[in-house]
Amino acid sequence: MKRNEIVIDGRLLKRGTLRHTPAGIPALNLLIGHKSIQIEAGGRREARCEVEAVAIGDLAVRLSTQKLNQPLQLSGFLTRHSVKDGRLVLHVVGVEPIGNGTE
């Protein structure tokens, strides 16, 4: 199995302090809030979640100044938080603004 691609619309709820990895690469922890209506088994279902995410490199620097609560489309892949912590984390590899922030 190779496929591990996530695209999600959400809002930047929290942003950590820009830090650097031991290799000197910028890194930024994020919390993304998502809310939508999805179709499941022919019915409408409200989907809500908060997703832990991390951005690395130039994207981390760019997101370190992103205004909170702005609608964004994020793309990336899922992996575990660390060797000892199995929580899922979205590693963001792409970000695009959505609309004018009124959605």
Positions of the model-derived regions?
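Single-stranded nucleic acid-binding surfaces, predominantly the OB-fold ssDNA-binding core
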Residues: 1-103
